[in-house]
Amino acid sequence: MKIYIFLLLFISNMGFSASINHIGQKGKASEVNRVIEIKMYDNYFEPNEINIKKGETIKFLIKNFGSLVHEFNIATNKMHLNHQTEMLKMMENEILLGDKIDYEKMKEIAKTDHSMAHSHSNSVLLEPNKSGEIIWKFNTETKLEAACNVPGHYESNMIAKINFN
């Protein structure tokens, strides 16, 4: 029984790692090649295109200048579409409140539903006037975009194209 549980946990963690490793991986501060500042406004990013070289480790300094909660998330289009269901659930559970994030409720609900923790290394969720950072190693040339998956924002084209040079 113990072996069965171990294998189940091992295989499920392998699947999770593989699902994100195909887009890159969390970078190390000591390996940062460049810093890119990202400004989030209500339903758009500046810059709206990001040029990357395969193998680069980028430190993204992200600030939300908008009046709403926004997310900066590095992923494929398909991953964004899947993540949007989690973000909708966060709104339905009143974790996302337009211009606020209820961190206490997030923490409580995440005890039974880990997807509500929003603890992804490729993403940051910010209230207005807040800042965050992501250090990301682009070790693949998979077609990526940075987007906000707060309900309605992706549909409003809050997307930054990631180009590989």
Q: What is each stretch, according to the model?
A:
Residues 4-13:
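Sec-dependent N-terminal signal peptides
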Residues 18-25, 44, 65-69, 98-110, ...:
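Extracellular/periplasmic metallocenter environments
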Residues 26-57, 115:
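N-terminal edge beta-strand
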Residues 32-36, 54-58, 68-70, 130-132, ...:
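Envelope-exposed proteins and targeting segments
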Residues 60-62:
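Aromatic/hydrophobic beta-strand junction motif of beta-rich domains
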Residues 71-75:
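Beta-strand signatures of extracellular beta-sandwich domains
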Residues 76-82, 163-165:
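Short edge-strand/loop segments of extracellular domains
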Residues 84-88:
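Outer-membrane beta-barrel and related beta-rich outer-membrane complex signature
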